[in-house]
Amino acid sequence: MITEDFYKKRMLQYYTDEEAFRIVYSFLEDKAKEAKSQGDKKKEQAYLEVRILFLKRNIKIRKEMDQLKAQYEYQKKRE
């Protein structure tokens, strides 16, 4: 059973993670552009690869968040 307190704390954590993701993703994008303008292909590739890893992590977090939200809403309907 998902308590309302747990649900609220977990959703807050998801939203905090989402905000952190946006900051890091933007930073990595800027660094990749900077490396490209300097002609450093290896650095650009490294920044892009890390950015992709963060994107995959964010997708996983969003799926977990959606699943928790669906479970909580279903539980509320049954009560």
Label every PLM stretch briefly.
Residues 2-34, 71:
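N-terminal acidic leader/helix
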Residues 26-74:
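Short, charge-rich amphipathic interface segments used for partner binding and complex assembly
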